[in-house]
Amino acid sequence: MKLRISSLGPVALLASSMMLAFGAQAASADQGIVIYNAQHENLVKSWVDGFTKDTGIKVTLRNGGDSELGNQLVQEGSASPADVFLTENSPAMVLVDNAKLFAPLDAATLAQVEPQYRPSHGRWIGIAARSTVFVYNPAKLSDAQLPKSLLDLAKPEWKGRWAASPSGADFQAIVSALLELKGEKATLAWLKAMKTNFTAYKGNSTVMKAVNAGQVDSGVIYHYYPFVDGAKTGENSNNIKLYYFKHQDPGAFVSISGGGVLASSKHQQQAQAFIKWITGKQGQEILRTNNAFEYAVGVGAASNPKLVPLKDLDAPKVDAAQLNSKKVVELMTEAGLL
C-alpha cells in the first residue's frame, strides 16, 4: 500500500502552516515576559501587578544587582531569556547598550519621559530617579561644619569623619558622574584621598545606620534610605539629617534608573508595552504613592510630596548615556577601594 503524500492541496497546506505559526505565536505570548530586575523589588512588584491587571500579560521577575545582571546580559548575548532590563542606576544600562543588546523604544514611550531623564538615542529610558545626599549626625557634626562640596571630603580635616559603600552600584554611579564632570585625573586623586579619609561599609542602609548610631559622623548615600526607614519605625534614621549639596556640585548628582527592551526578546510587543506602562501615568503615579520614595520622571508626573522637589536639587548636567562603569571600577581598584 502506498502512502498518500499529496492529499492536501496547496491552499490547505498554506492555511495549515499559518495556523501552526499563529498557534506558536500565541503560545509564546501566553508565557508572558521575563524581566531582569535590579530595581527595588517592592516597587517593581507594584508595577508588575498593575501592568498585568491592565493587560493580562504575565511577568516573571529575576532579581539581582545592577552590575550582576548587566554583566549576565552581556555574557548571554542574544541567547538571553530576558525581555526587559530594569536598573537602579544608569551605568549598567550603558554597559548593556554598548554591547548593542537593546532594541529602540517606541516613540510614544520616549515622549512620556522628560528629555533630561532619558538618553537621546532612545534605546533605553529613565523610569525613576534618586538623588545623592550627605547624611550626618548633628550630635557629631554641626551645620556650620558641613562640606560645601563632595570634593571637600578629600581634605585632611575629613579623615575618619565620613562613610560610604564603595562596592555598591549606587556609590559607583556617583563616582561615574564625578568622572564625567571632572575627568579621570581629578577623579582618581579624589578616590585616593577618599581611601585615606573614609570608613567603608557594605550597603547604603548600613552607612545610614552607622551615622544614626554615632559610629561615624556622616556618609554619602542616596536620599530615599532615610525616608524608607522613617516610613517604618525610623529607628535607623531618627538621629540623622539630610544635606543636599545643590549648586550643580558632583555631590548633587541625580541618578537615573533605567529600563530597556532586549533586541533578542521574542515578545517585543509585550516588552515594549511594559516599558510604556511604567513610564506612563499609572506607573509614575505608583512612584508618588509607593514607599520606595524615588522620584517620578514622567512628563507632568508628581513625586512623593515628602521629597525635596527634583527642580530644587540643582543637580549637575550629566549625560546618563556616557556614564562609564568599567572605567570607574578600574579607577576605584587603582585607588585601593575595591
Swiss-Prot record:
Binding site for Fe cation: 40, 88, 224-225
Gene Ontology molecular function, alphabetical: metal ion binding
Keyword Ion transport: yes
BP term (GO), one: transmembrane transport
Superkingdom, taxonomy of origin: Bacteria
Compartments where found: Periplasm
InterPro entries registered for this protein in UniProt: Ferric-bd, SBP_1_CS
One GO cellular component, as annotated: outer membrane-bounded periplasmic space
Entry keyword set: Ion transport, Iron, Iron transport, Metal-binding, Periplasm, Signal, Transport
Signal peptide stretch: 1-26
Functional note: Part of the ABC transporter complex FbpABC (TC 3.A.1.10.1) involved in Fe(3+) ions import. This protein specifically binds Fe(3+) and is involved in its transmembrane transport.
Family the UniProt entry places it in: Belongs to the bacterial solute-binding protein 1 family.
Subunit structure: The complex is composed of two ATP-binding proteins (FbpC), two transmembrane proteins (FbpB) and a solute-binding protein (FbpA).
Protein name from the UniProt record: Fe(3+)-binding periplasmic protein
Species per Swiss-Prot/TrEMBL record: Serratia marcescens
Gene this chain is encoded by: fbpA
